[in-house]
């Protein structure tokens, strides 16, 4: 890389890379140097240069220029590489209209420039209109989104009202879940979770069917009238539930079909296909509607029948009440009638009851049963008559045991109370004696002079005081000991009672599951459900309905039950497993299928269980007291797991101590130890999961929702205030851009406001539901809450349902429109052929960051190209070379030049007048003629070349190259002569009239500079570049810093990077204002300037000081080849 003096007086280094030298001539170098100089000068002037080290105040995300590399391709196309820090924010630098100001022209603009200006103005207008249209579309889309959010918030408010109006918690849950379901685009969720819904419906349907079959068998048997009415009532209720499930299923099918139609119309299909598909779906919908109408009528009929049966049951209840009033002597009959009354009440008012009322009613039934059995034992009526009734009497015995335990409990309590009364009695008497002793002591003090009379009294009083003290201490100790022991015994009894109750319920369930062949046990559905209800109540965790749903959805529960069991056994085992009280494990032998209790009933709590808990926990319907119960239950579980860990560790230690050297025993011990290790690992994993779950629950319990609510309200208030300020009352219609901008601001802030309102409504829903449940708890004993609430409000649930349906339809329509607009946008991106050229230009401007920079640099080169002296010289030389190549002459006289310009035609126009028909025929007939011609031409060329030039390998290669070129030229001429019909199309290649114009076009192609690409390369470490270090040294020298300190600092900065192996800095000039100029240099590390392979980065800069110019040179030796991206 040598240096040349520029004609304008600048010293410029030739920056032409080696790749350009293969096709560029030497006379083009001055032009390249001049262009490089212009580009570098403009870029370094207008872009901020990287300077090290950066100050603390400076923003490190700012884009700064490190280095420029200019590469040239064929026909003077320029590629510029800009090495920049943080190129992500580079678009801010290139937003200016022009980086460089072109010099002013004294002469006026030409016609071509005027036309260009007109076209630019037209294109700008088109762009503005296009931008306005795009902004309008976006605004419409945002408005749709705002409408959807508003409607969803309205819907959530109405849903909360409905939840308050509904009586039971189950309806609350259903409505609440449905509202959430609607908010998430109901149809899309149904289509996505289509198999899941079908599975749930199928499970419910199968359970209902099996129960109906069992009750049908029961009705066919010879039973009493009362029992038949009871079973009919159950049968009709189940039928009604089944019809509801079927109607829901039909509704799901309809929604799915509608969604299919919407999706099919969205695709790019023909009208015939769409119409055919529409017809098929319409037929399906018609059938589904007919079925739904049929089932609705059926459900109405069932409700009417149920009302009539209910009236009959009420009459029977009245008769039983009258019987109870009449019966005053027989206690057994009285208890039986009381149980029947309570059962009828339970049946009739099951749907309207609160959970607490149901529990109280069940407890009353149990108490009456206990009294009844007690009376039976006193009478001596309980006797085992047959083997079939043995189980029944065993259950009675268990009940008697329970009664005995409760009696003993009562006795203990009475003992404690009696002792308490006796203690109080003794205390009162002791106080009286104390008063008498005090009176005696008072007398002694008064009549102390008569010692003979009161001598014995003194000793008596002292003895009595000591006795009273002993009595008090003994009584206190006895009471404490008795109280502790009795309380401990009572606690043991209560635990025993609860375990016996649970076992009894589970035994009854297992009895029905085991004896599935007998008809009696198969039919006792009511018994089964009572027992299940008791077990369900005993377990604290299973009280949450969402947990029950999550477990029933799992399919692995069905695998635990063997295939040979009946439908009822499967249902019962599923229920028992879901309740998580104990796990039924059947023996491995297929012949004997006996249920066995598994002690490790907590094995059901797997990882999936915890994930389901977390999903349940996210649900808003979960309340504070429920989460508290969950927390307590999980804490107990964790303690159990810790104990289990300790037990396993102890077992492993014992086994290790018991291992013997014998092979037989050793293997068994090793296997058992391995199994225990596996169980220990699984247990530790489960403990970790439980701990995470407990932390989540603790957060839920401790978090304060009130603060979040207040924050949301404050944010909404701020948004309202801002909107009132920013939007004026009157908007000007002339300025469209400003109006659209204001509308955008208004809509965006309103969308944000609606989202915040949705969050606030969700919080309020949870609070309202929690308060409702508390209120129900408080007032459940006095009167049912649902009736009292309905009396206060005039709103009906029917009207609410209608309004919710209307809102839902409206939301679905708006969401469909919104989705269609999104689909159109995606389709517009894929299809590029329909776009106009203006839109294509708009897209390009969005994609490329450096388009504006490229255009400004191109204009700069164009203006300097027209006026510079160096470009004219290179242009003249290129022009002359083209003329010589095409066979023209450089200098002509006036007459000859005019003749040349008038006579000259395209080289292919002369071929039209020649007759090539004979040649064409000869070439087509003789296939070997072309090969022979080529061989002869080759021989002629070889003969022309001297023999001396054919010695070396290189000379042979060059000779072959020239031969190939000449043969190609010959073949082209042959092809033109043979295909004389295509000569007219070849005329358009050179669309010029004169020879001079053709030469000008070719010179423009070769010499006119064109900026093709501007590539931005990210620089991670600017310390690795010599340019940055040189800039740093120059800046410090200009600020009058000492040159040695600046050199040291620059070398430290460079050597701190791993890539740099060595640095050399040289400063020459009047250093520190000395009269004689000198050079100072500093070297750190290795800088091998003589080796060609060494990767050395060099830069030269000048510092302009008061005493003159100082030259700064920096050499950097890098370990690896230059890689700007590293």
UniProtKB/Swiss-Prot annotation:
Keyword Ribosomal protein assigned: yes
Biological process annotations from GO: translation
Cell compartment(s), UniProt: Plastid, Chloroplast
Gene Ontology molecular function, alphabetical: RNA binding; structural constituent of ribosome
GO CC term (a single one): chloroplast
UniProt cross-references to SUPFAM superfamilies, sorted A to Z: Prokaryotic type KH domain (KH-domain type II), Ribosomal protein S3 C-terminal domain
Region Insert: start-end pairs: 89-881, 943-1013
One Pfam entry name: Ribosomal_S3_C
Main location, first listed in the record: plastid
PROSITE patterns: RIBOSOMAL_S3 (PS00548)
Keyword Ribosomal protein recorded: yes
Alphabetical keyword list: Chloroplast, Plastid, Ribonucleoprotein, Ribosomal protein
InterPro entries per the UniProt record, alphabetical: KH_dom-like_a/b (IPR015946), KH_sf_prok-type (IPR009019), Ribosomal_S3_C_sf (IPR036419), Ribosomal_uS3_bac-typ (IPR005704), Ribosomal_uS3_C (IPR001351), Ribosomal_uS3_CS (IPR018280)
HAMAP family hit by this protein: Ribosomal_uS3_B (MF_01309_B)
Family affiliation: Belongs to the universal ribosomal protein uS3 family.
Summary of subunit composition and partner proteins: Part of the 30S ribosomal subunit.
Protein name: Small ribosomal subunit protein uS3c
């Amino acid at each position: 890389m040598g240096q040349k003096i520029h004609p304008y007086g600048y010293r410029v280094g030739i920056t032409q890379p080696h790749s350009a030298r293969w096709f560029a001539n030497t006379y083009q170098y001055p032009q390249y140097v001049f262009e490089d100089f212009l580009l570098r000068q403009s870029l370094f002037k207008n872009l901020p240069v990287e300077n090290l080290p950066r100050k603390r105040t400076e923003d490190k995300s700012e884009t700064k220029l490190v280095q420029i590399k200019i590469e040239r391709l064929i026909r003077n196309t320029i590629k510029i590489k800009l090495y920049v820090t943080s190129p992500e924010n580079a678009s801010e630098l290139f937003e200016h209209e022009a980086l460089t100001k072109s010099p002013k022209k004294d002469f006026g603009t030409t016609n071509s420039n005027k036309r260009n200006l007109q076209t630019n103005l037209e294109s700008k207008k088109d762009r503005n209109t296009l931008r306005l249209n795009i902004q309008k579309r976006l605004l419409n889309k945002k408005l749709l989104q705002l409408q959807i959010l508003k409607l969803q918030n309205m819907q959530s408010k109405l849903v909360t009202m409905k939840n308050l109006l509904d009586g039971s918690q189950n309806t609350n849950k259903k409505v609440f879940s449905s509202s959430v379901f609607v908010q998430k685009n109901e149809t899309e969720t149904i289509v996505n979770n289509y198999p899941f819904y079908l599975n749930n419906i199928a499970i419910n349907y199968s359970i209902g069917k099996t129960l109906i079959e069992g009750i049908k068998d029961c009705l066919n048997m010879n039973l009493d009238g009362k029992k038949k009415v009871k079973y009919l009532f159950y049968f009709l209720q189940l039928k009604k539930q089944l019809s509801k499930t079927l109607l829901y299923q039909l509704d799901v099918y309809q929604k799915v079909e509608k969604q299919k139609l919407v999706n099919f119309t969205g695709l790019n299909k023909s009208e015939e296909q769409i119409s055919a598909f529409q017809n098929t779906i319409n037929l399906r919908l018609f059938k589904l509607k007919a079925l739904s109408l049929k089932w609705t009528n059926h459900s109405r009929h069932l409700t009417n029948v149920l009302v009539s049966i209910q009236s009959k049951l009420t009459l029977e209840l009245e008769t039983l009440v009258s019987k109870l009033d009449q019966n005053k002597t027989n206690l057994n009959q009285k208890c039986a009638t009381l149980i029947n009354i309570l059962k009828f009440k339970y049946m009739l008012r099951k749907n309207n009851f609160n959970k607490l009322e149901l529990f109280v009613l069940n407890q009353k039934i149990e108490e009456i049963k206990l009294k009844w059995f007690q009376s039976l034992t006193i009478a001596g009526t309980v006797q085992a008559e047959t083997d079939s009734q043995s189980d029944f009497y065993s259950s009675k015995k268990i009940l008697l045991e329970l009664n005995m335990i409760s009696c003993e409990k009562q006795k203990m309590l009475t003992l404690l109370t009696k002792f308490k009364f006796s203690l109080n009695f003794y205390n009162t008497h002791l106080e009286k004696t104390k008063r008498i002793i005090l009176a005696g002591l008072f007398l002694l003090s008064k009549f102390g002079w008569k010692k003979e009379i009161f001598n014995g009294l003194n000793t008596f009083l002292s003895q009595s005081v000591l006795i009273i003290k002993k009595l008090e201490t003994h009584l206190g100790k006895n009471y404490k000991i008795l109280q502790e022991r009795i309380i401990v015994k009572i606690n043991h009894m209560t635990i025993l009672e609860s375990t016996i109750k649970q076992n009894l319920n589970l035994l009854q369930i297992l009895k029905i599951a085991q004896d599935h062949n007998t008809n009696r046990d198969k039919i006792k559905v009511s018994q089964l459900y009572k027992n299940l209800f008791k077990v369900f109540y005993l377990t604290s965790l299973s009280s949450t309905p969402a947990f029950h749903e999550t477990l029933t959805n799992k399919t692995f529960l069905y695998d635990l039950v063997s295939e040979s069991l009946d439908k009822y056994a499967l249902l019962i085992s599923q229920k028992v497993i879901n309740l998580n009280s104990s796990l039924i494990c059947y023996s491995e032998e297929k012949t004997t299928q006996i249920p066995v209790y598994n002690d490790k009933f907590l094995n059901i709590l797997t990882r999936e269980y915890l994930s389901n808990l977390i999903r349940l926990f996210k649900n808003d319907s979960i309340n504070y007291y429920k989460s508290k119960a969950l927390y307590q239950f999980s804490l107990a579980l964790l303690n159990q797991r810790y104990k289990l860990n300790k037990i396993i560790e102890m077992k492993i230690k014992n086994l290790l101590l018991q291992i013997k050297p014998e092979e037989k025993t050793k293997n068994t011990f090793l296997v058992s130890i391995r199994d225990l290790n596996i169980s220990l690992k699984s247990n530790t994993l489960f403990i970790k999961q439980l701990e995470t779950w407990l932390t989540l629950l603790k957060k839920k319990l401790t978090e304060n929702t009130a603060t979040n609510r207040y924050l949301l309200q404050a944010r909404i208030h701020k948004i309202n205030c801002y909107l009132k300020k920013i939007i004026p009352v009157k908007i000007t219609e002339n300025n469209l851009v400003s109006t659209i901008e204001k509308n955008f601001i208004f809509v965006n802030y309103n969308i944000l406001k609606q989202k915040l309102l949705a969050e606030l409504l969700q919080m309020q829903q949870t609070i309202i539901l929690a308060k409702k449940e508390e209120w129900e708890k408080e007032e459940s004993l006095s009167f049912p809450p649902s009736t009292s609430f309905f009396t206060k409000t005039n709103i009906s649930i029917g009207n609410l349902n209608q309004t919710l349906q209307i809102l839902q339809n409206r939301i679905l329509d708006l969401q469909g429109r919104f989705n269609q607009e999104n689909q159109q946008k995606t389709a517009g991106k894929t299809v590029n052929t329909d776009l106009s050229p203006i839109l294509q230009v708009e897209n390009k401007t969005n994609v490329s960051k450096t388009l504006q920079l490229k255009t400004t640099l191109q204009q700069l080169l164009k203006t300097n190209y027209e006026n510079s002296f160096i470009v004219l010289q290179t242009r003249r030389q290129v022009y002359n070379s083209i003329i010589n190549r095409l066979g023209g002459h450089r200098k002509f006289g006036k007459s000859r030049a005019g003749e040349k310009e008038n006579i000259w035609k395209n080289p292919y126009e002369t071929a039209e007048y020649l007759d090539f028909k004979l040649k064409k025929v000869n070439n087509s007939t003789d296939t070997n003629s072309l090969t022979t011609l080529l061989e002869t031409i080759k021989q002629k060329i070889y003969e022309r070349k001297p023999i001396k030039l054919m010695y070396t390998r290189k000379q042979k290669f060059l000779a072959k190259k020239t031969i190939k070129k000449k043969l190609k030229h010959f073949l082209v001429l042959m092809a033109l002569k043979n295909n004389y019909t295509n000569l007219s199309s070849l005329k358009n290649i050179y669309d010029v009239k004169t020879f001079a114009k053709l030469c000008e076009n070719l010179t423009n192609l070769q010499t006119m500079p064109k900026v093709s690409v501007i590539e931005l390369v990210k620089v991670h470490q600017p310390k690795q570049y010599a340019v940055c270090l040189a800039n740093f040294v120059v800046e410090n020298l200009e600020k009058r810093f000492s040159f040695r300190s600046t050199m040291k600092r620059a070398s430290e900065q460079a050597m701190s990077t791993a890539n740099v192996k060595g640095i050399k800095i040289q400063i020459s000039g009047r250093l520190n204002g000395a009269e004689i100029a000198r050079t100072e240099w500093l070297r750190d590390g290795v800088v091998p300037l003589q080796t060609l392979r060494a990767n050395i980065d060099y830069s030269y800069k000048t510092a302009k000081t008061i005493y003159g110019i100082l030259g700064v040179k920096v050499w950097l030796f890098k370990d690896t080849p230059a890689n700007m991206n590293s």
